[in-house]
Design a protein with these regions (language model features):
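Catalytic Walker B motif of ABC-type/P-loop ATPase nucleotide-binding domains
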Residues: 145-148
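Short coil-to-helix segment of the ABC ATPase nucleotide-binding domain corresponding to the Q-loop/switch region
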Residues: 80-87
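Conserved signature/switch motifs of ABC ATPase nucleotide-binding domains
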Residues: 119-122, 140
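Hydrophobic anchor residue at the start of the ABC signature
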Residues: 134
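Conserved ABC transporter NBD signature motif
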Residues: 51-63
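Conserved ABC ATPase "signature" region
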Residues: 87, 98-116, 167-168
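Helix-to-loop junction immediately C-terminal to a conserved catalytic motif
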Residues: 43
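The feature captures the beta-strand-to-loop junction immediately N-terminal to the Walker
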Residues: 28-30
């Protein structure tokens, strides 16, 4: 890919793999080995220097609604409430308020945040913020979920709960997930 200075960066080389629909792929490696670069290419945030990446039969050339991203840090809009953060993508798609309200409530219950909808996200713990980020991703029903070390900043107990939640959601939804981590335990 090209760096902000226009220099070519070879973070990945001779990489070729296929992920079947409904699989959960964990990419494990030390810091700096290209894990996040792989995810950023899959998300369409950066273009590969050579080669292609496809989702279904479509080449990925930029961000798209068919992919959802959960970052290491929640990347939430701190000035918005939990409901407003989770509903953000639906609002951008101009989903009807009645439908979006029901979907938000459903996903907040799934991620264990029922009753926190009107809470500003800056008042939440790190684990709760990650659950908001997960709900915000999943409510848009992406074909592919990209998770960039989403558990890395959490304490051990919260990390274990989030691991269980991610596995439960994966099993129940059948979504395809790529999870990036540097932790063998994850």
């Amino acid at each position: 890919f090209k760096s902000p200075k226009g220099e070519t960066v070879h973070a990945l080389k001779d990489l070729n793999f296929t992920i079947k629909k409904g699989e959960l792929l964990t990419v494990l490696g030390p810091s700096g080995c290209g894990k996040t670069t792989l995810l950023n290419i899959a998300a369409g945030f950066i273009r590969p220097t050579s080669g292609t990446i496809t989702l279904g039969n479509n080449e990925i050339n930029g961000p798209g609604v068919d992919r959802g991203m959960v970052f290491q840090q929640g990347a939430l809009f701190e000035w918005l409430t939990v409901n407003e953060n989770v509903n953000f993508g639906l609002r951008m798609k101009k989903e009807s308020p009645d439908v979006s309200t029901n979907k938000v409530e459903e996903w907040l219950e799934i991620v264990g945040l029922k009753g926190f909808g009107n809470t500003p996200t800056y008042q939440l713990s790190g684990g709760m913020q990650q659950r908001v980020a997960l709900a915000r991703c999943l409510i848009n029903d992406p074909d592919l979920i990209l998770m960039d070390e989403p558990l890395g900043a959490l304490d051990a107990l919260t990390r274990e709960k989030m691991q269980s939640l991610v596995l439960k959601i994966w099993k129940e939804t059948g979504k395809t997930i790529i999870l990036i981590t540097h932790s063998v335990e994850e």
